[in-house]
């Protein structure tokens, strides 16, 4: 196996109850769209994100009102909370005091060394990690002057400069991101960064666009980076409801076999042989399995030609055939059901498989 497939030598960093890096699975993040000082709205949005599989959530902290709301938000959510800080070191101190699980800063734009040191000492005292967020669109003047324009080399140099600031203060609970809206630039930057240091990498294609175009752009960029074995946590950035970010992120990870707690749908392309309402059924099943946290592969096939043989790798599935459905497990037909009830029958089988998975998981955990 190519040594680049799995980057397991990253330094493990604790973020709340999650470990980022090491040999741990990638985690999915998002960011709220609400005004952080509006606690009710922010908590409600985070709860929606939790329901669809968000594992870490970031909130903007642009002012004191936002910083003062962090403690109340933290108490009412169930996933690690990250505060996004720019320029004002006092907001970082307030966020740390409020009990956030991570802060995102650029040490270089916080101010004088004594201010950075105050933030680092506060984070160190509470075991709170710091994410260094490098962005191609906001590189330091000295980097742009040196390279002429945003380059992968410049982004990595910026990251290393910020890392050195923290390391000089004996701080090593660091996560790094190197985001760009240019997919090729992001891929190159993350590849170079993965070879330059062993801190965990937070992946993202920034300013990727709307739900449709941005989802495709993010999948293309993140997929290329993941195929190199790079990445420990990620966010799909969309101009859309953040719930959609989680949906895209989950599908990207599932496509690479990097998510052990998500169901996957296989459905055949439409053609003249289809004998059931495939599009409606596939969408209904996809919505049904969206919140199932078990690694079940589900197939929905439009005719007997494509199934069940061509989807034998699926755990469970249906294939339409003349007003009825062939229900199958691992390529073997288990029974025929009328088309009118075949989706409900499929859902029952999915629930059975999920329950079996959770029972086995519980048994294994009890043996540890």
Curated annotation (Swiss-Prot):
Cofactors needed by this protein, per the record, are:
[4Fe-4S] cluster
Q: Which cysteines are joined by disulfide bonds?
A: none
**Record function comment:** Converts 2C-methyl-D-erythritol 2,4-cyclodiphosphate (ME-2,4cPP) into 1-hydroxy-2-methyl-2-(E)-butenyl 4-diphosphate.
Gene from which this protein is expressed: ispG
Does Membrane count among this protein's keywords?
Answer: no
Q: Which taxonomic lineage does the organism of this UniProt entry have?
A: Bacteria, Bacillati, Bacillota, Bacilli, Bacillales
Keywords in alphabetical order, please: 4Fe-4S, Iron, Iron-sulfur, Isoprene biosynthesis, Metal-binding, Oxidoreductase
Enzyme class, top EC level, equals oxidoreductase
* Family to which the UniProt record says this protein belongs: Belongs to the IspG family.
What are the BP-aspect GO terms? isopentenyl diphosphate biosynthetic process, methylerythritol 4-phosphate pathway; terpenoid biosynthetic process
Gene3D superfamilies recorded: Dihydropteroate synthase-like (3.20.20.20), Sulfite Reductase Hemoprotein, domain 1 (3.30.413.10)
The UniProt record lists the EC number as 1.17.7.3
Instruction: Drop me one GO molecular function for this one.
Output: 4-hydroxy-3-methylbut-2-enyl-diphosphate synthase activity (flavodoxin)
Q: One Pfam family, short name please?
A: GcpE
Please give the name of this protein.
4-hydroxy-3-methylbut-2-en-1-yl diphosphate synthase (flavodoxin)
Residues annotated for [4Fe-4S] cluster binding in this entry: 268, 271, 303, 310
Q: Which reaction does it catalyse?
A: (2E)-4-hydroxy-3-methylbut-2-enyl diphosphate + oxidized [flavodoxin] + H2O + 2 H(+) = 2-C-methyl-D-erythritol 2,4-cyclic diphosphate + reduced [flavodoxin]
- Give the metabolic or biological pathway: Isoprenoid biosynthesis; isopentenyl diphosphate biosynthesis via DXP pathway; isopentenyl diphosphate from 1-deoxy-D-xylulose 5-phosphate: step 5/6
Cofactor, free-text remark? Binds 1 [4Fe-4S] cluster.
What is the protein's species of origin? Listeria monocytogenes serotype 4b (strain CLIP80459)
Keyword flag Lipid metabolism:
no
